[in-house]
Amino acid sequence: MSYENLANLIFPNIDKTPEYYFEKYPKRDLKEGAKVLRYAPSPTGFQHIGGVFASLINERLAHQSGGIFYLRIEDTDQKREVEGAIDDTIKTMHNFGMDFDEGITGENSEKGAYAPYKQSQRADIYRAFVKDLLRKGLAYPCFMTSEELEALREKQIAEKLTPGCYGEFAKYRDLSPEEAIKRIEAGENYVIRMKSPGNPEKRVVAHDMIKGEVSFPENLQDVVIIKGDGLPTYHFAHAIDDTLMRTTHVIRGEEWLSSLPIHLQMFEVLGVEAPKYAHIPTIMKMDGSSKRKLSKRKDPESAVSYYSEKGYPSQSVIEYLLNIINSAFEEWRAENPDADYHDYKVELDKMSKSGALFDLVKLNDVSKDVICKMKPEVVYDLYTNWAKEYDKEMYDLVTSKEAMMKEVFNIDKEGPKPRKDFAKWDEVREKIFYFFDELFDKETANDVELPKTLELEEAKRIIEAYEKAYNFNTDKDTWFSDLKEVAVELGYATDRKKYKKNPEEYKGMVSDVAGAVRAALTHRANTPDLYTIMQIMGEEAVRERFKKFLAL
C-alpha cells in the first residue's frame, strides 16, 4: 500500500482514474480511414506563416479523409501567454479557409465532446494519470534542487557523459515510498518524474510519414511529467491529450523529431497506442547563396500580418503553401486550372524531406494566377475590403465608382491570354490610379512615361492631331484604323516590314503614336488595352486628359 499512500498524499483530491476518462472520451465514431488531427499552438504570440503551413497540412489530411480537425491550446506556460493570441489564431486560420470542427472557439469558449481543449483547464485529468503511475511505481517524486541539477549537469559534461537525470544519476528514482512521504510531509519541494524503462543498448525504430524509417537510442531520461507548480510538462500533456482526444496523426515541425523517443516511451508506459507521426520540414529562405531558417526577427514575411498588409488574397497564400507541401500541386493546378484547391489530395510521402524553401517571387507568380482567374466582382470585393483597412483614400475613390471599377478589373480578362497585373492588393493603386483625377492630377511632366523614340514636344504634336480625329463612338477596329490614319499623316509607319527596310523614311511606328495617346491618358507606358481604357473613361474625360497633356 505504500505507493498508494504516496499517490494519495500527493493527489488527495483526485478520485477519478484513467479508466473513467477512457470511458468519458470514447473512440470516435468515424468511417474507416478517417483521420483526427489537431493544430495545437501555445498562445505566446501572434501567428506566423509556419503555423499556417502546419495547420494547412493538418486540415487537409483531416478533411480529405472525412475526419476531424480540432484546435487545442497548449497554455501550460502561462507566464508567456500573450493577450489576444487565441483569438488571433482562430481569426487567422478562418481567413485562410481553415475552420475547426471542434475545440477552442474564443478566449473563453469551445465546442466538442472532448472538452476541455485548453491544457490549463485539464489539470485534474493529468493528475489522475500521474496518480495512477505513482500507484504502479512507474513515476516518483524527485527532490533535487535546481542547484543540484546544475552541479550534476556540469559534472556530466566534464566527464563527457550525457547530461540529465537517468540511471545512477536519478538520485530519488529508488527512494522508498515511505521516505518520499516523509520528505513531502516535511515540506520539501519536488517534481514528478516518469521512470524510464529505456535500455542503453537498444534503439527505438519508428516510421515517420514524411521521413520514412527513423532510428534513435531509447530514451534513458527520467523526464519530468509534473512541474513544481503542479502543471504538466509539454511531453506529458501531449501524450494524455492526444490519447483522450483520439488523435490519430500528429503533424509537427522537425525540431520535435528528437523528442520522438520520449513521446513513444510515454505512450508505452501509459499502456496506450501512440498516434502516427510526421515531422514537417522547416521553412527556409535563400540568404545570398545559402539557405537559412525563416526568421521572425529578420524576415517580415514570416508574420501572417505581412500578407494582410501587402494584400495577398488568402487563396494565393494557400495555393503557394500547397506548392511547398507537394511539388506535384503545380502540375495538378496546370491540368485543373478552374478546380477548387480542396480537390487536390495532399500526400505526406510526397513531401520534401529537406527544408521547404519560401520564395516571394514564386508566391507573386502564384498570386497573379489566382487573381487573374477571379471574377471582376470578386476582385472588387476583396480589394475594397483590403483598402478599407490599409488604403482609405483608394477605398473612398473605388467605392464611389463601383460600376466603373468592375469594368476596370475586367480589362483583358476574358481573352485566351488574360492579363496578370496584380499579385497583391497594394499594387492596385499604381496600376489604376489614372482612372481618378484626384490621383492623376498630382503627377507632373517628370512622371510621364513616353515611348523611347519620342520627346515630349513630338508627343504633343501627335495628341494635337489625334484629338481632332478621335471619335468615341466607334468599335475597336475602326478606332485603330483612325489611329493609323493619324500615324500616316504624321510620318509614322503602319507596316513593320516597311519600317525595318527603310527606317530613315519614317519618324517611327504606329505603336509610338499609340504610346503617345497612352501616355497622355495614363502617364504610363505599360497598361491594359488602350481602347478599353478610353471607353471606360468616357469621351469627356479623354478629351480633358488630352488638354492637360498639351498643357504640360
Swiss-Prot record:
- Reactions the enzyme catalyzes: tRNA(Glu) + L-glutamate + ATP = L-glutamyl-tRNA(Glu) + AMP + diphosphate
Any single GO BP term: glutamyl-tRNA aminoacylation
In this chain, ATP is annotated as bound at 296
Subcellular location, in the record's words? Answer: Cytoplasm
Keyword terms, alphabetized: Aminoacyl-tRNA synthetase, ATP-binding, Cytoplasm, Ligase, Nucleotide-binding, Protein biosynthesis
Q: Where is this motif: 'KMSKS' region?
A: 293-297
- List its EC numbers: 6.1.1.17
Which is a Gene Ontology cellular component entry for this protein? cytosol
The UniProt record lists the keyword Cell membrane: no
MF GO annotations: ATP binding; glutamate-tRNA ligase activity; tRNA binding; zinc ion binding
The keyword Cytoplasm is annotated on this UniProt entry: yes
Name the source's superkingdom: Bacteria
What enzyme category does the UniProt record give?
Answer: ligase
Q: Which SUPFAM superfamilies did the record assign?
A: An anticodon-binding domain of class I aminoacyl-tRNA synthetases (SSF48163), Nucleotidylyl transferase (SSF52374)
- Note the InterPro entries from the entry: aa-tRNA-synth_I_cd-bd, aa-tRNA-synth_I_codon-bd_sub2, aa_tRNA-synth_I_cd-bd_sf, Glu-tRNA-ligase_bac/mito, Glu/Gln-tRNA-synth, Glu/Gln-tRNA-synth_Ib_cat-dom, GluQ/Sye, GluRS_core
Give the residue ranges of motif 'HIGH' region. Answer: 41-51
What is this protein's function? Catalyzes the attachment of glutamate to tRNA(Glu) in a two-step reaction: glutamate is first activated by ATP to form Glu-AMP and then transferred to the acceptor end of tRNA(Glu).
Quaternary structure, per UniProt, is: Monomer.
Q: What does the sequence similarity comment in the record state about its family?
A: Belongs to the class-I aminoacyl-tRNA synthetase family. Glutamate--tRNA ligase type 1 subfamily.
Put simply, this protein is called Glutamate--tRNA ligase
